[in-house]
Amino acid sequence: SLPFTFSCPSSHDALLDLLDEHRIEPSQIHTVVSRIRTLHAPNLAEENPVKLQRFLGALVDHVLYRAGQQDTKADDLRVINDLVLHIYELARAYPLRAAEHFVAKISLMQHNLMRGLALGALDPNARTWPRLSELAFLRMCVLLWPTSDKWHAVATPMHLLMAQYLAHARIRSLRDMASGLYLCSLVSSAQRESRRIVPEALNALFNIAAMLLSLHHGKSMHGRS
């Protein structure tokens, strides 16, 4: 049976160890996180706020971990959705620490993009477009942070990063195209309230449409020959 008491993991590795030690099923993770937050509520001990702020970082890492699995299943998606709710509540309780966690991830993604572009935007081995885990993280940013503000500590660098992806990454495969289209959908969601125009997203959509039309035209000509 599921224990009622758990330690409060201070890192993602500690969280994975806890889940493995107690043989926690994906369907039980939401309950485990709820119990950890209850057992380590900030009003129960002076050190608990610090514990929960570290736990927040572990939960963010676990979302990326689940989304980045090679064989992501429906269980993983349910876990991600459950964890986003916990992250949202903890981010509202500790906004400064939450912002630090998110900005650190955004900075790392931007560094990886620059390193990939340095290899050459068309190099098949260059990591330019975000992977599934990174797309899940950007979606979480759009859901959790106010994207209509003129300037925001998390949302502004997120907007700039998505614009960089769309402006500088080049489509080399259908996977790249899917990443580009999903980024455009995130941009649309993020700018729905402010109604800002993002030229990088419009240009990316135009380029993708042109590529698809070219492929369709090529197949049509091949079929007639």
Language model features with spans:
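Charged, alpha-helix-enriched surfaces in structured cytosolic catalytic cores
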Residues: S27, R54, R78
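Eukaryotic nuclear macromolecular-assembly scaffolds and interaction domains used across chromosome biology
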Residues: H62-S225
